Amino acid sequence: MSFSFGFSGDDIEVDGQATEHEALTNKISECALSDSRESPQNTVEPKRHSLEELLASLPSRVSYGTLRIPSFSEYGKLRDINSNDPGAVTSVYRRSVFDIRAQLMAEANPSAEEEEEDTARTLLSGLESGDLSSGIYEGGFKTWECALDLASLVITEKDVSGYGQGQENEDDDDGPEAWEVVELGAGSALPTLALMQKFIDRRRERPTTHGGSLKVTLCDYNADVLRLATAPNVFLNYLFASSGRVSHPLDDRGNPADGDLDLEELGGEALVSRTIQDMTADDISFEFISGGWGPAFLDLVYPPSPPSPQASLGETDHQHPPKPTNLLILASETVYSPSSIKAFTETVLGILASHYRRFTAAPVIGRPSPPPRAWVAAKRVYFGVGGGVDEFVREVERLGGRSRVLVDVQDAGVGRVVLEVTLSPAFMDSAANT
């Protein structure tokens, strides 16, 4: 399926920061150009984080904005964001930028010397001036056009919901499909949040026992982006979508509006714990990974398989195969820097290959998983720095993958696309035998 559509900057920055967004877009090019001329820096060691850990520093009151994401009509056009037709628009909640800024100001060390490292101060500088620091802050608190492109595609595609095509029959012995989602360079994680909303909407249509499962891994180089933006966004969206205990304000059209959430009034830590327990009961789980891409990162996404308990009894893994899952990798604005395209491409194909070995090439319980895939949204070219779609596609093909255009974005600015990346037949044969 191929769509052609466009977004303006005003569709993105609901905090009244469209001008700042444009300036930060220019900073991406400057940062990538500087990064490509310098020798590679030591990357941060990848680390896994839990939702509980990341929400521990959440303040007692959280301000949030609401973003309405349109789906596509059958003719490939974006629906009206004010449409009341079922499924036409999905509302996604995100923590307000000014709320993140307020927390960073509270955490910054005012007595630190200029040369001393103060992460909060560095991140605050990035928010206030639009400065990007390679390997420290690369715009993760902002919402970019490509993330919206990807979110619209997610809510439009009928087979991305927690239910597989042809598996919606409650009498099906194999049951509904299990989904795994990995978002790289997640930032505000809008595409994943849109997918979770879609999953929960489908859950309401069927008994819980037939609701499928959703396992999400959200990844960002910066652990503070995960802590201050990504995890709070997950919490807000699940809380509003699934809980009858918490309501949100509505605008004059009856749509969700911006607001404030008083966590202390609603139970504080007990509310957070109860919400995470509800996620588990709904077969929804979230994990988070910070740090740089590479072999260690891949091991956190898909840990090496330990010997099975049955092996010591003389049984083989073929006698105890895993239950299949569908894998979808999501990524947006991750190919702007020529110095990181190779590592990013290796990471995408590495995750696809790991999943293929475990759930597609190997024996599984029930139906085999379909081939894993990745959806990568990017600008066609990042002027002046060499990054962009063409270089990424060349790297995908060089490493044994293949790609095709799913979405072609046409507007007054730089062209944007969403690519689907899969393993080539030769790559799949190689992966199955390793």
Model-predicted regions and their roles:
Residues 1-434:
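S-adenosylmethionine-dependent methyltransferases
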